[in-house]
Design a protein with these regions (language model features):
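Active-site adenylate/phosphate-handling loop in enzymes that bind or generate adenylated species
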Residues: 207-252
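Donor nucleotide-sugar recognition loop
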Residues: 197-200
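Cysteine-centered catalytic environments shared across enzyme families
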Residues: 2-195, 205, 209
Length: 252
């Protein structure tokens, strides 16, 4: 699921596939009709989930799935070979949980430090990216290459926090400010994403990648922390809503 795979069967006999939708579009007979359900998914979710794409008859391979195609046979359903196990884990105390989390984080970072190209990290100053940078600093001898993107609107600018983390771990730190009206990238991003994708951080993410590329080839990031540990306010509101629902009679 880390790398996307797009595919389509043209005229029932030709398989075209690639890691980007634009690669498939190089085929002159690729279907170009918009898939209405994909448009509905986009407006509901902000993106188009697998296996659909914006084009009818063009599909994405689901994460953790395989697809076996045989000549002369219909396209089978995608086969799931792995998924995240959601089994309860028996842990004695909260301290044990914290120790396990730190060990897993350190292991994950250490695995990704094995590379033949220069490495760095995106640093926002938040808990997620700061934890990754801290682990990198503990696991490697050379200073970590970090980069941060700030905004010219003070309430959204977090570079001060990133700078403090960089100072704490002695990183080689780069910063750049993105203007609030930096819309020059819209056409570029539309071409890169290949299909509708609503992400308010798309522009700063592209800019921080540009900044990182000045020094490194691969950069680690702290994505996923808020989703896994309920860091957004919407999770708190959802929890309160569920508590309220549980207190009310089912008839209401």
């Amino acid at each position: 699921g880390v790398k996307p795979l797009f595919f389509s069967i043209i005229d029932g006999r030709t398989l075209v596939f690639g890691s980007e939708l634009k690669v498939l579009k190089a085929h002159p007979q690729l279907p170009r009709q918009v898939e209405p359900q994909a448009v509905e998914d986009y407006f509901a979710l902000g993106y188009i989930p697998e296996p659909k794409t914006i084009y009818r008859g063009v599909f994405k391979l689901r994460p953790g799935h395989t697809l076996l195609l045989e000549r002369g046979k219909p396209v089978p359903a995608q086969h799931e070979y792995w998924d995240v196990p959601f089994r309860p884990v028996a842990v004695a105390t909260e301290a044990d949980l914290c120790e396990e989390l730190f060990a897993r984080l350190r292991e994950a970072v250490e695995i990704r430090l094995v590379a033949e190209v220069p490495l760095g990290a995106f640093l926002s100053g938040g808990v997620d990216s700061s934890a990754v940078v801290a682990a990198m600093a503990q696991l490697q001898h050379a200073p970590v290459n970090t980069c941060a993107i700030g905004f010219d609107v003070p309430q959204f600018n977090e570079t001060e926090f990133a700078r403090k983390v960089a100072q704490r771990y002695g990183t080689n730190h780069l910063e750049r400010i993105v203007a609030s009206d930096d819309f020059d990238l819209l056409d570029t991003l539309a071409a890169l994403y290949d299909e509708p994708y609503a992400d308010s951080s798309a522009i700063p993410t592209y800019r921080v990648c540009q900044l990182a590329r000045e020094r490194v080839t691969v950069a680690l990031s702290g994505d996923g922390g808020d989703e896994n540990f309920a860091g957004y306010r919407r999770y708190r509101w959802h929890m309160n809503e569920e508590r309220l629902r549980g207190a009310l009679p089912l008839g209401l």
